[in-house]
């Protein structure tokens, strides 16, 4: 747990308004996705035979299952036919659209071992990244309703969420196998800043005029203000990767609260932390 923040005039790092984090361009998106899947592949290549069956924070998914999901997701990005195969069926009651695609990705690859799955991922990801960059302006005209929050713009899905999904699964596997996650401010810091940008869109309206400062420690961290135009009256401090695990739904509120330090208006900080959720 981090120590409480000291007076802003002496020690607090400069904070950026999360809503003002620059949006992702298509060119940057392709570069970020390329760097991320390259890191993901390198992690897969470093795993040993004992790692593939290990459980992960993704319910019912092993390390091998996450690799199958990523191979399937990039195969869907590389081929329209495969994309429609994965996404053309309506979800069941209580499911989200991505639950259907995920289930199909794993079912189609049920008999494949890690080496075959990794070979598939390597073969399809360059085309997937290129096609998503090409199609983002067109699909950006479409926003799909979601039962769990604001609608999902498909341009945002193509330019931001797919790369974020790979990034988050790299974190899942790093934690599951006890490996340190490769982190740099330029790459992972940008990933995290975009998470805070989305958090501002989701959480900001719920805070009204109030504002909360999020201080995330580590190589990919930083400080951001979420909420109204007023000066922040509360601070939430967490380690960056723990914050993303929580924001993605992999920690309960109780688990996140135990890892966070709240200061200032702690009631406001608790309200903000409870409502912290972002699509990954």
Stretch-by-stretch model annotation:
Residues 36-39, 43, 73, 124-127, ...:
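Amphipathic, well-ordered alpha-helical segments in soluble domains
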Residues 29-36, 117-120, 124, 158-165, ...:
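Amphipathic alpha-helix face/heptad-repeat signature
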Residues 20-68, 77-79:
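An N-terminal domain-cap segment
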Residues 54-95, 144-203, 243:
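Short, contiguous alpha-helical
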Residues 2-28, 75-134, 138-142, 280:
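Short, helix-capping/interhelical loops that line the mouth of catalytic, cofactor-
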Residues 231-280:
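C-terminal interaction segments
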Residues 135-140, 180-183, 206:
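Short, structured loop/turn "capping" segments at alpha-beta junctions
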């Amino acid at each position: 747990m981090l120590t409480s923040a000291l007076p802003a005039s002496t020690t607090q790092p400069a904070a950026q308004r999360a809503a003002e984090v620059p949006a992702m361009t298509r060119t940057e998106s392709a570069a970020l996705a390329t760097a991320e899947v390259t890191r993901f592949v390198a992690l897969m290549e470093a795993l040993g035979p004992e790692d593939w069956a290990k459980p992960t924070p993704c319910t019912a998914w092993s390390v091998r299952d996450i690799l199958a999901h990523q191979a399937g997701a990039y195969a869907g990005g590389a081929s329209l036919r495969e994309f429609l195969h994965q996404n053309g069926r309506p979800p069941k009651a209580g499911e989200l659209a991505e639950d259907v695609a995920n289930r199909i990705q794993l079912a189609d690859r049920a008999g494949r071992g890690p080496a075959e799955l990794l070979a598939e991922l390597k073969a399809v990801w360059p085309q997937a990244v290129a096609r998503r960059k090409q199609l983002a302006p067109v699909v950006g005209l479409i926003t799909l309703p979601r039962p769990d929050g604001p609608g999902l713009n498909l341009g945002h899905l193509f330019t931001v969420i797919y790369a974020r999904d790979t990034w988050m699964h790299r974190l899942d596997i790093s934690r599951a196998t006890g490996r340190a996650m490769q982190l740099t401010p330029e790459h992972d810091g940008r990933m995290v800043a975009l998470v805070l940008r989305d958090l501002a869109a989701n959480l900001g309206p719920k805070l009204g005029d109030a504002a909360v400062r999020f201080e995330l420690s580590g190589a990919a961290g930083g400080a951001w203000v979420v909420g109204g135009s007023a000066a922040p009256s509360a601070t939430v401090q967490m380690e960056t990767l723990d914050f993303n695990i929580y924001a993605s739904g992999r920690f309960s509120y109780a688990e996140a609260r135990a890892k966070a330090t709240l200061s200032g208006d702690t009631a406001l900080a608790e309200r903000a932390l409870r409502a912290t959720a972002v699509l990954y």
